[in-house]
Amino acid sequence: MKAKTLIDAYEAFCPLDLSMEGDVKGLQMGSLDKDIRKVMITLDIRESTVAEAIKNEVDLIITKHAPIFKPLKDLVSSPQRDILLDLVKHDISVYVSHTNIDIVPGGLNDWFCDLLEIKEATYLSETKEGFGIGRIGTVKEQALEELASKVKRVFDLDTVRLIRYDKENPLISKIAICGGSGGEFYQDAVQKGADVYITGDIYYHTAQEMLTEGLFAVDPGHHIEVLFTEKLKEKLQGWKEENGWDVSIISSKASTNPFSHL
């Protein structure tokens, strides 16, 4: 089948025009006219995922994080550039779905809500009329530490960071969540009455500002977005069966999380 057939189906579900302004999105390398027999879904494109794609004879990679985010001035061989050069050398096309999969109803932030049993979820921060990034909803009343433990468990994490002073452990019931690095949206969580905000990459001073505003937070890291790989694989497999596509779909097993904890 042609790559375009699969991508057209994906964009019917998750349109590119939902992406935030200035985002990198869509086909980034290769051609939509190429024949594809194997597709791999990954969160990131690093040397390990490229090696995995080459080993598995992948024709198309669908990634959340673009391998080219800033303009390139050259493609001279280097450890970073070789990631791209290897993709070109092995004729592997790359398609990027970044903030549009965060925003689309039934996408990544809704998958997070399903895992954490967040009910009555609506968007956190409006990006265009009727759509927004992040989600805010309710859970049964519980202690902050109980929620943090659940986040650790469902995302299979060694640790999470709690944003609180003096080991406070308040009861919470209204939760905001945004995958990736969502610190910039914390004011939306405050304005909409959230007790706690779950997001990654929270900066030191942002954490202090949150607490001053009465907002607690749980920082599970950026890498919880890896949920994208298995959930999108499930969706593509469903479309494959419905449409009789002759293509194999795999999710990356390579680790791209650069952090670990002692």
Swiss-Prot record:
Protein residues bound to a divalent metal cation 1: D102, E225
Keywords: Metal-binding
Record: residues binding a divalent metal cation 2: H65, H222, E225
GO MF, one example: metal ion binding
InterPro entries from the UniProt entry: DUF34/NIF3, DUF34/NIF3_sf
SUPFAM superfamilies cross-referenced by the UniProt entry: NIF3 (NGG1p interacting factor 3)-like
Metal-binding as UniProt keyword: yes
Pfam families: DUF34_NIF3
GO cellular component: a single term: cytoplasm
PANTHER family xref list: GTP CYCLOHYDROLASE 1 TYPE 2 HOMOLOG (PTHR13799:SF14), NGG1 INTERACTING FACTOR 3 (PTHR13799)
Family the UniProt entry places it in: Belongs to the GTP cyclohydrolase I type 2/NIF3 family.
Oligomer and partners: Homohexamer.
Protein name per UniProt: GTP cyclohydrolase 1 type 2 homolog
UniProt source species: Streptococcus pyogenes serotype M1
